[in-house]
């Protein structure tokens, strides 16, 4: 164990070289002939421990004066202290060894070293000494590139980001080398050492010492990927260490990364080794260069705003943070926060469907199988169709707030099994614009008739017989023709259409009949048929009319037995079949008809109940609904010459427990009793 004189520790550190010794073989100041165990020590000033590099002094080197290498081996455990060119290592004589001696017996804890000449302990081998003491390249010079940029950062206080995954340095460490042997092989390395043992903090716009720093990790060298290479190659290009990454995490993936502690000051250094074998770099002579303006402080986030501005203005990868960069604020319009020329998927063309203020809730689509009623009831009737895009207008079907949503399936050839409006839905634009943009308009298409009301209720009526399955019953309807204008007979056909879809609620049917704009042709029924039906004020859903015994003469011939059973009038609950009720619609009151009138909801229109004349010229739709099941009875009248006025209600709602489930047209013979008619259905 060796010790330094206590009286000399407080002396000043000088940057002058030690005087040449008498035993110097090369004439270089501070390089005496030394050997330990027969091995010459070419670079005095370092304590050599095997082949591992020494920890450099924790003081900032004032200039870029090269520091001679520190790689050599020892065959002995003897510690040698020598004079060095580096004043930060030692300023004491290399020929003095300070042994431990006991001079003061009373103070055994105090030891005064005794100087002793140990020069005779070194064996001299001039050939080996010349080999190790020769400088690799005395004319070698290193120039720092981007010196002006480094000076700007140095004046502001350079900060480097360290992350767990590693962050590259900016400004990048780039150098230019000269004075090498063009034919010799060289390896270039980079390491980063700590400047002092302090931890820093940024306070009040400047960096101050915050306490003692954390223990520093062993140094790691970053070997340039082009190593080894000829001297001519190194001198012909700029050497860049832009791939070096700074990290604060010790992990397995440390290739190309240098581990540093945050909030500490560090100094990058460049080492040049003359060798052609990478595996023996640590055993070869090297030259080290350092530049004072490259000192930086490691941070996890930039502390100084001036440094941040310099990084943004000079780093090509930080263009997005500039005022005119991609992350700069752009003017936004009031609709979609995008410019008119923006091709973003959230542009106005695609976002108009979600324009705020058009409706209160998002649209609800009833696309459940078999139209199973959903528990989500959104107020879609307040929806403004003007905000809907073209694609959505052709697909969305408004729905009511009733428990059972109306069926939205379209019945036409090729779509018999449709259970959802997404399979085939008519163009609502055509229906909306069918009659001067009136909601109460009818779009008579080639395949089916669609009635679109203002309340958002739609109904579909096929006009041609199409193939059907067990789920649907189609009916045949006749349209008026000019060729049959002279015919005087009345063709009336009844059919029953049953479906497995969700049934219409009573309120839906009432809205359909209330806002329907479907007209029927003028019908002429013989005046011998008289009608005396007592309508209830309740309209749809009320009890059926019960004619008295005196009214039997006014019934349609052949229907007296329907209302007579052992001299008792049948009430609505005992009616055996809905087909019997159809005959009630045959009771008409003759009168003169006026042209261009509309069919109204007779059960709810006071004018109709009071006996006013109502005319019709197109198709009259009669629907009979029950509470449990809904059956649409539609009656088509074709009239060619005369007119017929109607009185009283044309829609009935009865309770029936015996509803015929038939998929074909039913023909009711008025000359038969109700039991025979039931069998024929």
Curated annotation (Swiss-Prot):
PROSITE patterns: TBOX_1, TBOX_2, TBOX_3. Residues 316-351, 456-489, 521-558, 589-611 are annotated as: Disordered. Disulfide bonds: none annotated. SUPFAM superfamilies: p53-like transcription factors (SSF49417). Its main location: nucleus. Keywords: Activator, Developmental protein, DNA-binding, Nucleus, Transcription, Transcription regulation. It is found in: Nucleus. Residues 521-534 have a biased composition (Polar residues). This is T-box-containing protein 2. The lineage of its organism: Eukaryota, Metazoa, Chordata, Tunicata, Ascidiacea.
